[in-house]
Regions:
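Enriched for short, Lys/Arg-rich terminal
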Residues: 2-4, 10-16, 20-26, 30, ...
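A short, surface-exposed loop/turn module that caps and links secondary-structure elements
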Residues: 33-61
């Protein structure tokens, strides 16, 4: 892997909640693997940068209403997984 993976405490909680909701964990694991290898995600994942409170982070869609918020720290080659959940879970919308 090109990047080491760092899970925030909140991401760990979100990941457990995703399992409890019976979401297909293999989908998020595959995306995390691609990101850790420095690969671009397919267009269907709608990967894009965030602004405001999430400036410096990126967001991609695992499914239409299941998101992954992450950021790269290229100085130390770390992929930080910040949050996962629905739009309302993450942004209150």
């Amino acid at each position: 892997m090109k990047y080491q993976i760092a899970w925030t405490a909140q991401f760990k909680k979100d990941y457990k909640l995703a399992m409890k909701r019976h979401l297909d964990i293999e989908l998020i694991d595959a995306i995390i693997k691609k990101l850790a290898n420095g690969e671009e995600l397919p267009e269907q994942n709608r990967d894009h940068g965030l602004s405001g409170n999430w400036n410096g982070h990126r967001e991609c869609h695992i499914t239409p209403d299941w998101l992954l918020v992450y950021r790269y720290d290229d100085d130390v080659l770390v992929l930080t997984l910040a949050r996962t959940g629905s739009h309302s879970d993450l942004f209150g919308k």
